[in-house]
Amino acid sequence: MLMPLSFSLQTKEELARVKARHPCCRQAELVAFLRLGNLDGGQPGEETVLFTTPYPALARKVYSLAREFLACPVKVRNSRRQGKGRPVFRVVARARLKEIQDWLAGRAGVPEYPCCQAAYMRGAFLVTGSVNKPSGTHHLELIFPDAAMAGQMQGLMQQQELEPRLSRRQRGYVLYLKDSEQIIRALSLMGAYSAVLAYENVLIFKDMRNRVNRLVNCETANLTKTVETGLRQAENIRYLIATVGWDYLPPALREIAAVRLQHPEASLKELGEMLHPPVGKSGVNHRLRRLELIARQVRGQGREGYAPDDDLSRPRA
């Protein structure tokens, strides 16, 4: 049973099928393959293993580029260890190791043009790179055998408005990106557009989920505040009824007090719609604040401290 490919391998499968438009870009990609792919000249006769990989798409890509730019016959060999496991593909050139090294020496440094730089970065990523799935920890990295090559790539990436960090590890020098926008830019530069879409879809989903959570939290906070306020107002109303008496309150205050006692969780708008005739939020708020003020006055001075205002008047017959 075949195991599903990881996001990193899916990205490499996609990049292995990208063909640069210009010959200079294709050559830059081949240079990255040969520099980082562990050339092996210990073959019988005048042969050099240019590249070894278990992935056929990548072997085909290196084979195609080598045939285009190397002035020697190139072929692909595959083998299985004792007939088991995945096949290993070797791209072999009929040329001595020194000839290949001389060809590389004539193309030292990093490419000059942005399109060639992107192709070179794609080749390097296909050989030594990896990228985490977008739903996990954001991380893209490239591994180099020495500080000089890592420094060259770091400079190239900086020219492409990327800011990779450099770290020394046991397996070599690692350039890595942690920022999701930087990773998306790197994938886009290399031509991994399906991977970019996958990344952006996950980021959009995360953003929408965060927005929903913020709205829910805000609504919850508002609801909690409304309920707490309603309970406090209901407690003040019960205190007034117990001290100054229900009939001692003006009719407008008696009406809102009765509704608030029945619905301590209701909002100002909902309370206003329960009155006859309905009253707006500001009117409801004014009456409730008036009740709270009366409750404070009575608590401070007793029943004698409460004198109904003319605008709300004394109880009417």
UniProtKB/Swiss-Prot annotation:
The keyword Nucleus does not apply. SUPFAM superfamilies: Homing endonucleases. Residues 267-300 bind DNA. It comes from the Bacteria. One of its GO terms (biological process) is regulation of sporulation. InterPro entries: Homing_endonucl (IPR027434), Sporu_reg_WhiA_N_dom (IPR018478), Sporulation_regulator_WhiA (IPR003802), Sporulation_regulator_WhiA_C (IPR023054), WhiA_LAGLIDADG_dom (IPR039518). Keywords: Cell cycle, Cell division, DNA-binding. One of its GO terms (molecular function) is DNA binding. HAMAP family: HTH_type_WhiA. PANTHER family: CELL DIVISION PROTEIN WHIA-RELATED. Belongs to the WhiA family. Involved in cell division and chromosome segregation. This is Probable cell division protein WhiA. It comes from Moorella thermoacetica (strain ATCC 39073 / JCM 9320).
